A protein has these predicted regions:
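Positively charged, small/polar-rich N-terminal and surface patches that mediate targeting and assembly
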Residues: 1-138
Length: 138
């Protein structure tokens, strides 16, 4: 089975609208992350990235419904301002495999030079958490 990851960057608090439109077209839901832009320019403003606060929306769908989901998202945002945001898709089928597709073999290299630390903090504390991580060597 083939999968596509739909990624959108939209104004802050507009992510729910994107996920609802996707669900209406058959998606099973989505993930909304709070994003913060760091650069400002006329080009970024033209692309819809003018203000710093953004929602990054990720929706995983099967290939056969991708076009319907994207169309529903675009249609649901047509009444918004011209530069509402940006939307694109990635083919992630090679990254997503069911356990039985590889015969149950473990192919992960357990020796790693890096570690992933995931942290969930209350709204407004992200910069404090990042500052603490950087001071600890991250």
């Amino acid at each position: 089975m083939s999968y596509r990851l739909i990624i959108g960057i939209v104004p802050h608090n507009a992510g729910d609208e994107i996920v609802k439109a996707a669900a209406k077209a058959g998606a099973r839901g989505g993930t909304i992350l709070m994003g913060t832009g760091t650069a400002s320019s006329n080009i970024l403003s033209l692309l819809g990235f003018g203000s710093a606060g953004k929602d990054v929306v990720m929706i995983l769908v099967e290939e056969d419904i991708k076009d319907a989901v994207v169309s529903e998202i675009v249609e649901s945002t047509q009444t918004k301002k011209k530069s509402f945001g940006v939307l694109w898709t990635l083919n992630v089928s090679r990254f997503i495999r069911c356990g039985n597709e590889r015969g149950g073999k473990t192919e992960m290299n357990t020796a790693a030079d890096h570690q992933l630390i995931t942290l969930i903090v209350n709204k407004g504390y992200a910069e404090d958490a990042m500052a603490a991580a950087r001071s600890a060597g991250a």
